[in-house]
Swiss-Prot record:
The gene is aroQ. It comes from Thermotoga petrophila (strain ATCC BAA-488 / DSM 13995 / JCM 10881 / RKU-1). This is 3-dehydroquinate dehydratase. Disulfide bonds: none annotated. GO terms for molecular function: 3-dehydroquinate dehydratase activity. NCBIfam families: aroQ, PRK05395.1-2, PRK05395.1-4.
């Protein structure tokens, strides 16, 4: 069982961004937390981060994973290309946001990508990733 975790633009700057919104975790801390979860749950996890839409598309198009957790970052609000790629990906998938996008600026409240995911977790900090991973693990176990 392999789960791909995709982090979009500016998520590499965690720990340097507004800590009131994004917390104190660095991207490296987040990757370690996800990898630790994978080891404890006997799930292969790969964390991929890019600030470039095309690189994210290319990674999704490889289709070499059984489940997907994605934080599209700002692409959430306008990337129809990522939305279409997510629609192509026929695996359990969850959109995650560290902050509660529904309590932020108006332009951040709309997600064009969530409607092609199984669900969206927003506002639970980095722990939203763990909840998404748990869901995907359970969903994949049900399918086998």
């Amino acid at each position: 069982m392999k789960v791909l975790v995709v982090n979009g633009p500016n998520l590499n700057m965690l720990g340097k961004r507004d800590k009131n919104i994004y917390g104190n975790f660095s991207h490296e801390d987040l990757v370690k937390m996800i990898e630790d979860w994978g080891r404890k749950n006997d799930v292969e996890v790969e964390v991929f981060q890019s600030n470039h839409e095309g690189e994210i598309l290319d990674r999704l198009h490889r289709l070499d994973f059984d489940g997907l957790v994605i934080n599209p970052g700002a692409f959430t609000h306008y990337s129809y290309a990522i939305r279409d790629a997510l629609e192509i990906v026929k695996v359990p998938k969850v959109e995650v946001h560290i902050s509660n996008i529904h309590r932020r600026e108006e332009f951040r409240r709309r997600s064009v990508t969530a409607e092609v995911c199984d669900g969206q977790i927003s506002g639970l900090g980095v722990y939203g990733y763990l909840l998404a991973l748990e869901y995907i693990k359970k969903k994949l176990e049900e399918l086998t």
